[in-house]
Amino acid sequence: MLARSGWLSLEALSEYGLSLAAVRAYVEIGFVEPLEVGGAWYFREEDLLRMAKAERIRKDLGANLIGAALVVEILERT
């Protein structure tokens, strides 16, 4: 039911090239906010895409996690 409403489970992480450790870190810094149901996290597809963009910035430019998240937020404002 959640998948039909636009929320994706942690199993979708691999489709977006995201590790569980990276997702936990993005949640910890407040870059994304999961929906928690029964102890499981669910994310909107747009949040998974935001994290994937930040991860590409980290890998391609050598930015740290907070810096990559900040770049994504700045790009979204333009």
UniProtKB/Swiss-Prot annotation:
InterPro entries recorded: DNA-bd_dom_put_sf
Domain of life, source organism: Bacteria
Keyword NAD (UniProt): no
Posttranslational modification: The N-terminus is blocked.
Keywords recorded for this protein, A-Z: Chaperone, Stress response
Claim: Chaperone is one of the keywords in the record: yes
Self-association and partners: Forms a heterononamer with DnaK and DnaJ. Three copies of each protein are present in the complex.
Biological role: Required for correct assembly of the DnaK-DnaJ complex in the resting state. Seems to stabilize this ternary complex until it is replaced by substrate proteins under heat-shock conditions.
Protein name as annotated: Protein DafA
Gene that encodes the chain: dafA
